[in-house]
Amino acid sequence: MKVEELIIDGFKSYATRTVITDWDPQFNAITGLNGSGKSNILDAICFVLGIASMSTVRASSLQDLIYKRGQAGVTKASVTIVFDNTDKSNSPIGFTNSPQISVTRQVVLGGTSKYLINGHRAPQQSVLQLFQSVQLNINNPNFLIMQGKITKVLNMKPSEILSLIEEAAGTKMFEDRREKAERTMSKKETKLQENRTLLTEEIEPKLEKLRNEKRMFLEFQSTQTDLEKTERIVVSYEYYNIKHKHTSIRETLENGETRMKMLNEFVKKTSEEIDSLNEDVEEIKLQKEKELHKEGTISKLENKENGLLNEISRLKTSLSIKVENLNDTTEKSKALESEIASSSAKLIEKKSAYANTEKDYKMVQEQLSKQRDLYKRKEELVSTLTTGISSTGAADGGYNAQLAKAKTELNEVSLAIKKSSMKMELLKKELLTIEPKLKEATKDNELNVKHVKQCQETCDKLRARLVEYGFDPSRIKDLKQREDKLKSHYYQTCKNSEYLKRRVTNLEFNYTKPYPNFEASFVHGVVGQLFQIDNDNIRYATALQTCAGGRLFNVVVQDSQTATQLLERGRLRKRVTIIPLDKIYTRPISSQVLDLAKKIAPGKVELAINLIRFDESITKAMEFIFGNSLICEDPETAKKITFHPKIRARSITLQGDVYDPEGTLSGGSRNTSESLLVDIQKYNQIQKQIETIQADLNHVTEELQTQYATSQKTKTIQSDLNLSLHKLDLAKRNLDANPSSQIIARNEEILRDIGECENEIKTKQMSLKKCQEEVSTIEKDMKEYDSDKGSKLNELKKELKLLAKELEEQESESERKYDLFQNLELETEQLSSELDSNKTLLHNHLKSIESLKLENSDLEGKIRGVEDDLVTVQTELNEEKKRLMDIDDELNELETLIKKKQDEKKSSELELQKLVHDLNKYKSNTNNMEKIIEDLRQKHEFLEDFDLVRNIVKQNEGIDLDTYRERSKQLNEKFQELRKKVNPNIMNMIENVEKKEAALKTMIKTIEKDKMKIQETISKLNEYKRETLVKTWEKVTLDFGNIFADLLPNSFAKLVPCEGKDVTQGLEVKVKLGNIWKESLIELSGGQRSLIALSLIMALLQFRPAPMYILDEVDAALDLSHTQNIGHLIKTRFKGSQFIVVSLKEGMFANANRVFRTRFQDGTSVVSIM
């Protein structure tokens, strides 16, 4: 809110209506002679703001505010301020929708004042709240700075300066709340002491006496209850025991009679069964004799089996040799490939070194040639100068010959420069002839280039559209090729799978879902397909197969419920054994036993389960099958481990021999054919490959269908793209064949040739300079020689010796480089030759590998054929053997069963005799017990309810009955003694006293809790006050120093705590003038002290800015330069607030944006704008 217009009518020296408009929103100054009414404008503003202290507006009563106290015909004083309220963020509460706010205060002679807001009458409190909401509280006017306030600040003590900071921070309110809380706490403490005294001196002694009496009464009640309970327990136990014995004997009698009847029937039935079984035995013996008289079919089948086994052994031996040859050749091939790769790398390295050495050798040779030429010329010169004839016998040597040669070279270089210059001139002339056509050609070419660009952009857009649709022609081709490869691979893998499937037929497990929502994941599968053997452990396959035995084809399921459902409703096609994970019990070999076994035979023993990989979910099944057997390398190790006293575990050798700690040994001759478990592993791997290939094939097929569908959708775009590509090709051809393009190309060629000529001229000019220098040098040497032949000749001889030495060194270097060059050349040729030889050898090895693979494939096919025949023969042989074994097994079973029946019959007869004797004894005991039970019922009525008796006995199970009888006697004696001493009314008396005690303790606890909360509140208030005070002090002292430095350059001031005290105990002003800190403000001049006070006031104003500030001649004690600094400070630092300043000094109002001048005319004040 900013002052926009001030209307004064009848207020103090303004007798008539005076309107002061065009107030600046930032800096306004009022000036004029003393007594002209300057300060009356400020008084009028304070009057409207609702000032209550008349002394502030220099009046003793409201009547003094009317012009000449109403004696000049003016009977009321009225002041109106119109505020600009366009800044909604700083608007008073409830006035955000008013762009202007008009506030009027009137005082009538002899009456009271009234207020109007926007022309409507309003109570004084509403006006005060309006201004307080925008920090214009006239009754605590921080925004009003009178001259006297500066003097007051100068004389403030540290505690008073701290009060200014507290006022700015707003922590006075915290002091009031703290004092209130301390008064409340004092009252609470008094009440607390009263309650504690009452509790200690009156209630607690009385309560202690009553509690002693209560304890005695409770003890009496407890004794009475224990006595009744103990007597009931003793009687219940006696009755229950007798009753239980009686019932037990009765049941025994009934069961004995039933059992006797059953035994008689069993003996009779068993005799009949034994007779029947003897007849069956005789019949089976006759059948066995008939089977033994048949021809020797088994012998023929065994001979045929041995022949097939020998053939398989021979073929596998051949295959093994072939495989070894193949592996050996493959290893050699790999070694050759590695050697070829290494040799190729070395050859590249040698060739690189050879090229570098060749380059160095040529450079050295060139330098050597130049050095020899220089030496030869020097030698000829010395010879000519010495003898008149050169070393070659020519008479035209010496300086003259060298000078002639140098001049010839100089002429040749000059001629070359002229030729290049002439060529460049001709090119420039041709360039001038092309230039007129170049502009038109460029323009025409730009059109062609633009056309090519447009065609290219069209093609790019069409390609982008195809990409958006996800269509890629090359992708379809790649997918089609991949689909063909996957199909071929799939058919071949399926063929291999079918072959292996015939060899492992028992792996098939098919079932129908027992019910629709059957959880298929609960059926884990056949054991043989649930684990894998790593290639490193494949040699253990026979041992692991022996370890698993028939369980290899068992089916693992999650629980017994799943197993039951499969057996009852799964429609299984063959008999299977199911392993439910929740029912099997495992006893795997412990880690300690395994460690001991490995220590006894290091590297030769391992737990079977550790040689396979499987899913964690079926760990229990794998432990059940493989967890209790050790795999050993050889029979010696197996014996050592199996029969060790601390191990005694089942062991299996790699050949499949089983060693049992009970002394059983099984094994011997086994098939030499490949292990069934290896076939199962191969079959499992191939099945996984088929699944992977099928998934890849499905993915490729889906992507192909997507691409075909996209191709149909984008046919139009593809046609447009082909057409655009054709247009682009035509446009490029047109661009290349266009004469304009040829002109531009020729222009570029000429510019390039001109550049080459310029470079050649520069190079030749450098050579020309060298030739000129050489001519000058020779001429200079000739002059020196003519003037002093002896000295010059000696100098030339020295140079010749030095050149000879350098030539010798360079020749040595040349020879060294040549030797290195030749060595590298030989090494490179040798490496190249070796590489060619190795490549030829590798080619031969690869041919051998292919040949061996074909031979191996043929052998494997033959082996598979023979193995198939072997399987057929073995099946027939097993069936024949099984028929004989079945007869023997059946005969043994019948004989065992007869023996078992005879034993059962004998045992039943003995049991029958004993039972008759016992029954007679039990009948005599029953009558005695019935008499005792009847006596107890008559004595204790509660025994009629046997359920109650049973519950009593159950609750006190395991007690010592004799101890309880003794305890019952002691309790009865104690009960009779206590009955004489107790007070039966004690419970009612103690209840009232305890309630009073509890109420007092609750009250004390509540008061202590309230006291603690008050203390916490005071502590929090002190912490918050200090934090707020420190932040305010830090901000104010910073602004204080900056403002003082602006007012008095090269100076600084700050607020600091008194020496040795905290910031909350008082603040004092420290001033630095130049580089010297002043000990006291007394050392400062009056103007400097005024600046200090004014800087502090301005810093406080800046901490919590108000929308308007009123300053009344605050610069009275300052010189002109300081006054000007204050004006500048207001203008630069307080941009968000409106200042109204009364000043007589030009330095102040020269900085103001608006200056009002007052003057006294005809007895009234008049205001004008400067």
UniProtKB/Swiss-Prot annotation:
Keywords: ATP-binding, Cell cycle, Cell division, Chromosome, Coiled coil, Cytoplasm, DNA condensation, Mitosis, Nucleotide-binding, Nucleus. Residues 172-469, 678-1027 form a coiled coil. Pfam families: SMC_hinge, SMC_N. ATP binds at residues 32-39. One of its GO terms (cellular component) is condensin complex. Disulfide bonds: none annotated. It is found in: Nucleus; Cytoplasm; Chromosome. Residues 523-641 form the SMC hinge domain. CDD domains: ABC_SMC2_euk. GO terms for biological process: cell division; chromosome condensation; mitotic chromosome condensation; mitotic sister chromatid segregation; negative regulation of meiotic DNA double-strand break formation; rDNA chromatin condensation; tRNA gene clustering. GO terms for molecular function: ATP binding; ATP hydrolysis activity; chromatin binding; DNA secondary structure binding; double-stranded DNA binding; minor groove of adenine-thymine-rich DNA binding. It comes from the Eukaryota. SUPFAM superfamilies: P-loop containing nucleoside triphosphate hydrolases, Smc hinge domain. InterPro entries: P-loop_NTPase, RecF/RecN/SMC_N, SMC, Smc2_ABC, SMC_hinge, SMC_hinge_sf. Forms a heterodimer with SMC4. Component of the condensin complex, which contains the SMC2 and SMC4 heterodimer, and three non SMC subunits that probably regulate the complex: BRN1, YCS4 and YCG1/YCS5. Central component of the condensin complex, a complex required for conversion of interphase chromatin into mitotic-like condense chromosomes. The condensin complex probably introduces positive supercoils into relaxed DNA in the presence of type I topoisomerases and converts nicked DNA into positive knotted forms in the presence of type II topoisomerases. The flexible SMC hinge domain, which separates the large intramolecular coiled coil regions, allows the heterodimerization with SMC4, forming a V-shaped heterodimer. Belongs to the SMC family. SMC2 subfamily. Present with 3290 molecules/cell in log phase SD medium. This is Structural maintenance of chromosomes protein 2. It comes from Saccharomyces cerevisiae (strain ATCC 204508 / S288c) (Baker's yeast). The lineage of its organism: Eukaryota, Fungi, Dikarya, Ascomycota, Saccharomycotina.
